[in-house]
Design a protein with these regions (language model features):
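Short, well-ordered alpha-helices that flank and scaffold nucleotide-derived cofactor binding pockets
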Residues: 17, 21-25, 113, 273
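Glycine-rich FAD pyrophosphate-binding loop
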Residues: 20-45
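N-terminal FAD cofactor-binding segment of flavoenzymes
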Residues: 38-87
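Helix-loop-beta segment of a Rossmann-like dinucleotide-binding subdomain
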Residues: 86-108, 190-201
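Predominantly flavin-linked oxidoreductase catalytic cores and closely associated redox partners
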Residues: 110-219
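FAD/FMN-dependent oxidoreductases across multiple families
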Residues: 200-304
């Protein structure tokens, strides 16, 4: 059987890692080819991961990745100016566990140069799936040119300004997410620089005003990239029973909880079951859609209590949460509200009860921000 992966961005590399690992350790007989267009460059920003990701690096590269792949540890997320109760809220990861920060271009180069399981790379721009001789194709070629075959996901943001700050010695070991008058800003400490991004809505704040506020609040001198975006989910993620979508080709949501990398891994797990374990297309698509909608609803929940700023953006963001159906999250909150501290402590090492979040994480946001 032959599997072709299109694109060597984050999702393409994760897909290659996933299926190459199972080929080696479960003796899955599959030929893997990764095809990419070298003219397409990664978005120039830092990347945070969820807790599952270091384990996948270890499974593919062993402990050597710690010394040869430039990363910083991520021990949690610091929320600043969210809600009305506290100026700062730190969401810690369970003791002894951590996620990572890194640059996507360095991650992608590392995977393609060090994946210790045979696969071939080909630099080519593929126009038609029918031109590919493969039993299955995983398409990870990024943002679609048209959203005709996609549903819109609900979120108050649609643009980001990307920049860098000079590296600090002994910098923090977590991601900062700071609420601003226009939305929020991420701060990701990398080995050689600080990646910082200002997220906002162009229907509320002009790009020029956002640039001005970004520079004023965070001391940014040069803005590297203006990144407008839509938030969406494919209506059909398995096409003609053999083309499987992943990465931004499958869905896109804002990066507030750094859910992208963990979601790409989860999607690969579903596709593995579809290809090798006989899971149906209908069940596979249902599970992926359910996963993405849970992420969509919990991210939107972060805006429910507003922020330190009573601005037009935050009024609209709170209203958006109020008028949007969050049935999946509401069911989870109803259960979690009544859980004891002992019950919650038993979930600390959970890989995720509600998409990527154990009950402890959701309860913390409810108690410290939203209630």
């Amino acid at each position: 059987m032959k599997l072709i992966i299109l694109g060597r961005g984050n999702a393409g590399c994760i897909s290659a890692m996933h299926f190459a690992y199972y080929r080696k350790f479960l003796n899955t007989k599959v030929e893997i080819e990764l095809i990419y267009d070298s003219k397409i460059k990664p978005v120039p920003t830092g990347q945070g991961t969820t807790l599952q990701f270091p384990d996948w690096l270890f499974k593919n590269f062993g402990s050597n990745y710690v010394n040869s792949f430039p990363v910083t540890q991520k021990t949690g997320i610091m929320y600043e100016n969210w809600g009305k109760k506290h100026k700062k809220i730190f969401h810690p990861f369970p003791l002894g566990r951590y996620a990572l920060h890194f640059s996507p271009d360095q991650f992608q180069d590392y995977v393609c140069n060090n994946l210790d399981i045979d696969f071939t790379e080909r630099d080519e721009n593929i126009k038609n799936y029918d031109d590919l001789d493969a039993d299955y194709i995983i398409d990870c070629r990024g943002t679609p040119k048209s959203l005709k075959e996609y549903d819109t996901l609900t979120n108050p943001l649609n643009c980001a300004l990307l920049a860098n700050l000079p590296k600090k010695e002994n910098d923090i070991l977590w991601t900062r997410t700071t609420a601003t008058p226009d939305g929020w800003c991420f701060y990701i400490p990398l080995p050689d620089t600080i990646s910082i991004g200002y997220l906002f809505n162009t229907n509320v704040t002009t790009v020029e005003k956002a640039k001005s506020n970004f520079k004023k609040i965070f001391g940014v001198e040069k803005i590297n990239h203006v990144f407008p975006f839509n938030q969406y989910l494919a209506k059909e993620m398995i096409i003609d029973n053999r083309v499987l979508l992943n990465g931004n080709k499958l869905f896109f949501l804002e990066p507030l909880e750094a859910t992208a990398m963990g979601s790409y891994v989860k999607t690969c797990q579903h596709y593995y079951n579809y290809i090798f374990n006989g899971f149906s297309k209908e069940n596979t698509e249902y599970e992926i859609k359910d996963w993405v909608h849970k992420i969509e609803q919990f991210i939107l929940y972060h805006y429910a209590a507003g922020s330190a700023y009573d601005t037009k953006f935050w009024k609209k963001a709170k209203k958006l949460y109020e008028i949007t159906s969050t049935e999946l999250l509401d069911k989870e909150l109803k259960i979690i509200k009544d859980m004891s501290d002992l019950d919650l402590s038993r979930t600390l090492s959970s890989s995720g009860e509600f998409a990527l979040w154990p009950p402890f994480s959701i309860k913390q946001w409810y108690d410290e921000v939203a209630s």
